[in-house]
């Protein structure tokens, strides 16, 4: 005889929360990528930053940039900048455009280049003759889409004393306006060249707040559009041995998140 069975398959979508991230729902995609074996070493004078575009993750050490598969962590080789010199910080916007900055001392020309992908030649997005009296270019951040509406920020820093200021460019319809200097008031202190200060806009709306972190204040500050600190959201647990830096803001499942990286600034303790 013949035995016959009929099966029916139905697809069920797991329940999804309406807002934010559910703790424990994350999955580690890859880990243990040995940068040392790739010749990417931690050393003085390096300026580390990350950007993501398409299926690629870009790691910059300043003058040198390296490509990885963002889904697997596989090393893809060096990033060809096609002759464009951008030895400063790097980031990517909400649309996957990559932004590259150069380092600029006082009175030098500060430039930010943009490319839609790692295959495209970076083109100049904005330039500014550095009249701040300090240096700039180590950290840049962006919210929005630089081909449409966005905000680009760049902290300034000095090796002589401390500063508590950053520059802001409002981009409308892909066109950057003249930069505005924002002086932060209400923070614990300023930062110098070792402070690794970073500031990130909440959105592409210039009236929205910013998030700021740096050594050695070691706190996450909420700063309004005028530069006044309104909240001190998080503080370090290691005191002067902490280093708050690398702020980022993103939207996930209808919720806004601000993230910071906390490391040890010193080798003791």
Functional labels for PLM-detected ranges:
Residues 242-269:
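Loop/turn-rich, solvent-exposed surfaces of beta-rich toroidal or solenoidal domains
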Residues 43-50, 83-95, 130-147, 186-204, ...:
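Repeated scaffold domains used in trafficking and secretory/extracellular systems
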Residues 64-69, 106-114, 153, 159-170, ...:
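Structural motif
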